[in-house]
Amino acid sequence: MSSMDTSVNLQEEYNKTEIAKILNLLNEELVGLVPVKSRIREIAALLLIDKLRKNLGITAGSPGLHMSFTGSPGTGKTTVGLKMSDILFQLGYIKKGHLLTVTRDDLVGQYIGHTAPKTKEVLKKAMGGVLFIDEAYYLYKPDNERDYGSEAIEILLQVMENQRDDLVVILAGYKEPMDKFYESNPGLSSRIANHIDFPDYTVEELLKISKMMLEEQQYQLTTQAEVALTQYIAKRKEKPLFANARSVKNALDRARMRQANRIFDSRGQILTKKELVNIEAEDILQSTIFD
Ligand SMILES: Nc1ncnc2c1ncn2[C@@H]1O[C@H](COP(=O)(O)OP(=O)(O)OP(=O)(O)O)[C@@H](O)[C@H]1O
Ligand SMILES: [Mg+2]
């Protein structure tokens, strides 16, 4: 029998992994992020097919899987990084499947000779998993020619190239500084196969995220409160330091506090379950954003 006649069962292989479950969960748990989700699906498909090819003795260089996540604050970069490590583990691409989040200070030392051991220590801990470098652009300080950041980048580059079967590196940060960072470090940029951009959420998406967050904590918006929250989000979006889903999360924490306060002030009443669950419009409208 020629080797071309050998076959594998895609469905069987697919079922062996938990990948379908993870992709579905990803879809359900994360609102919006359509381009991000489709890239993840593509990566998962590539890895699965690669595995099948290997089973049949068709070899291909293992695809580089280093990634770049760019986007505004609170758009889900860290959250997706965690899911990504799950997926890569399920597909057998990484052996341990943990995610280690670091920033510049974990990699770069203050004094001469301190950076290399620091960076190597971090890389050792991350082996078999995902190294998530948050605010990666801080690694490179062009104004300071004695900066030890470039030493860390050198070591990182070598490992990204030579040990790509054992480690996936994700560089994350806000779009503009990351673009500048890559311009100054083309070697790094070109070793990253997947540049994924996280779009800002629309008001509708943020409302949907709010409802999911509340549901998780067994709270509910009244119809009026939902109107108020929609107005709140539209206003908050235009203010400085807006951080997408994180701003919404913080706003909901404050609304819960106001709800508790409101109920507390009405002491003496017998409380119903509904009253304890409901967030009312006034719990939202008391925000200073409406002043
Ligand atoms: N699409 C989404 N659906 C539901 N919840 C989300 C979504 N995106 C983000 N969140 C929630 O919003 C919060 C902030 O997300 P996350 O920390 O992943 O953002 P980030 O992009 O890493 O932000 P930063 O750039 O500031 O580090 C988390 O609590 C996360 O669960
Ligand atoms: Mg983050």
UniProtKB/Swiss-Prot annotation:
<keyword id="KW-0150">Chloroplast</keyword>
<dbReference type="InterPro" id="IPR003959">
    <property type="entry name" value="ATPase_AAA_core"/>
</dbReference>
<protein>
    <recommendedName>
        <fullName>Protein CfxQ homolog</fullName>
    </recommendedName>
</protein>
<keyword id="KW-0067">ATP-binding</keyword>
<dbReference type="InterPro" id="IPR003593">
    <property type="entry name" value="AAA+_ATPase"/>
</dbReference>
<comment type="similarity">
    <text>Belongs to the CbxX/CfxQ family.</text>
</comment>
<keyword id="KW-0934">Plastid</keyword>
<dbReference type="GO" id="GO:0005524">
    <property type="term" value="F:ATP binding"/>
</dbReference>
<feature type="binding site">
    <location>
        <begin position="71"/>
        <end position="78"/>
    </location>
    <ligand>
        <name>ATP</name>
    </ligand>
</feature>
<keyword id="KW-0547">Nucleotide-binding</keyword>
<dbReference type="Pfam" id="PF17866">
    <property type="entry name" value="AAA_lid_6"/>
</dbReference>
<dbReference type="InterPro" id="IPR000470">
    <property type="entry name" value="CbxX/CfqX_mono"/>
</dbReference>
<comment type="function">
    <text>Necessary for the expression of RuBisCO.</text>
</comment>
<dbReference type="InterPro" id="IPR041627">
    <property type="entry name" value="AAA_lid_6"/>
</dbReference>
<dbReference type="GO" id="GO:0009507">
    <property type="term" value="C:chloroplast"/>
</dbReference>
<dbReference type="GO" id="GO:0016887">
    <property type="term" value="F:ATP hydrolysis activity"/>
</dbReference>
<dbReference type="Pfam" id="PF00004">
    <property type="entry name" value="AAA"/>
</dbReference>
<dbReference type="InterPro" id="IPR050773">
    <property type="entry name" value="CbxX/CfxQ_RuBisCO_ESX"/>
</dbReference>
<dbReference type="InterPro" id="IPR027417">
    <property type="entry name" value="P-loop_NTPase"/>
</dbReference>
<dbReference type="InterPro" id="IPR000641">
    <property type="entry name" value="CbxX/CfxQ"/>
</dbReference>
